[in-house]
């Protein structure tokens, strides 16, 4: 008889891949030191190898990137920029490489349509952003010069998603997003830490967005590496979209809710802490590697586990939610709540305005 649950071997495999992605296996001992050194050498060599004259697009190009492996908050930053620049009268397009999407491997230029495309084809983040952008577009191609040439024909501003390591496209504004709790990713390259680039490159940033609570010690650490203006933001929950009902509930609906949580994030602890602050009673977690989607069998397994603990639902991020597709309609699955988030400015809205004003100046200077 065919089981609807994953095998114990698959669950073990999942736990192992999560542990590896967080540096809890390969980061041990001499092996970890050797692999971290190799990773840093590759990062250095790659930058020197591709350090040629970058392509200059006719539109203003804003890069949003980081120096660690995932979990810093790039996607909310991109969406915040696009929304606020649109409010100032600009047309915006997002340029993504479609990480883990099939079309990126095929080197096809795709303008993402949420009604036509899946996360498996274009990538989870491009699909999420395309569904949220108003009057904008998300272009996916492995070579961002190709997408920039096409997007510049119709859009004033091009936002380069995960663009800090991109040397092929000229960037007018360089924004680096860091996690306030761990801005330097443990200060070691993967797998001993979460660094993907050298901290001294922070001095190349025009603005640094510090996402989440940042203690005085971490602020001093950031100031040691870069004198660029810091914008402190606090991610918070705006509402929860429950599937399959489509019901949208405010933040206070989470208070006292007993639920399970699954997510595929580079820094899942930040999401879990946010839910706890909102009053969620977390009955269990199912962690996935960054960008990985939960399978049908895994969802049945986790839902049954939470139901046995008298849970009322399962919570996940919007990024995880776009990968679910029709799985939310599976019989026997608890309701799935997709948690939607927004930014609050910790050092006043003026800090965000200064960034937008800087983009205004640069864009007007290019005309």
Swiss-Prot record:
Extract the InterPro entries matched here.
Answer: LpxK (IPR003758), P-loop_NTPase (IPR027417)
**What processes in GO biological process is this protein linked to?**
lipid A biosynthetic process; lipopolysaccharide core region biosynthetic process
Amino acids binding ATP: 68-75
Q: Which GO terms describe its cellular component?
A: plasma membrane
Q: Name one GO molecular function term.
A: ATP binding
What does the UniProt function comment say about this protein?
Transfers the gamma-phosphate of ATP to the 4'-position of a tetraacyldisaccharide 1-phosphate intermediate (termed DS-1-P) to form tetraacyldisaccharide 1,4'-bis-phosphate (lipid IVA).
Q: Which HAMAP family match?
A: LpxK
What is the protein name for this chain?
Answer: Tetraacyldisaccharide 4'-kinase
Q: Which organism is it from?
A: Chlamydia caviae (strain ATCC VR-813 / DSM 19441 / 03DC25 / GPIC) (Chlamydophila caviae)
